[in-house]
Amino acid sequence: MTVRVSFLIGCLGALTLPAALADNGRLIATGGASSIEGTAGGGLTPWAVLAGYGEQHEWGATAFATTVNLPDYRLDVAGVALAYDNRVELSFARQRFDLGSLVHKLNLPEDSLGQDVLGLKVRLFGDVVYDTLPQVSLGLEYKHQTDFEIPRLVGAKRDSDVEGYLAASRLFMGAAFGYNVLVNGSLRYSRANETGLLGFGGDRRDSRSLLKEGSLALLLNPRWAVGVEYREKPDNLSFAGESDWADVFVGYFPNKHVSFVLAYAHLGEIATLDHQNGSYLSVQGSF
């Protein structure tokens, strides 16, 4: 799978919703972007916000395409998300991870790994802007690794799993020299190897770990945002170390229907190859 503009346009055209589509509703950029697992949030981490800009009794929806180019690998992701009543979100993402030079280095039987991610997120309480409490959401993700031969060879125990996370998001108005600041923190309960692309559990550890994730975004104006993300990851496989992930990003939100995120992703060691740092680009359409 390669990321093509035509795919994104097709996804957007396929999203048919009732007449109560969100148009005004939440502040621009507070719907976030799309994470690599399909849910609303940052690129690497989910936020407590839901897809699109729908409020009470309104629908919201997004479709996105993301590509991450690294020295030895490439990750392509495409997906959609649908939310209703600013209460519940369903999402789906399909990932393809090209193994690049690792194929010849380790004489691998496949040249890529794939994963499908089906997500459910429910807002428990609060609001990212208008409540005294932060918006808090609970999420579940069912992940299925679709090319399990390589993960099995390196020690992964299973090709699918369910993981949960709890996220809290809050927009602080004028908090940084007059600029708005969005803060998100998440706890994930997971045993995924490289987010599931290398299966789940391993010869070193097969139980789930409680993992920290966070995002900080400075809204320079209603259309531009800059920020950082961090994602802690487990270390379940003995054949290679697994680095925590981080990025520095710039987001552009010209209106509520399209957004662009460009980032420098610091992903460290992936499957024995270190210094996997490179560019991240995501395009999202919203309703």
Locate the predicted segments by residue:
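Repeat-unit-sized solenoid/scaffold elements
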Residues: 89-100, 164, 201-219, 247-265
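Transmembrane beta-barrel domains of Gram-negative outer membranes and organellar outer membranes
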Residues: 22-148, 152, 159-164, 169-175, ...
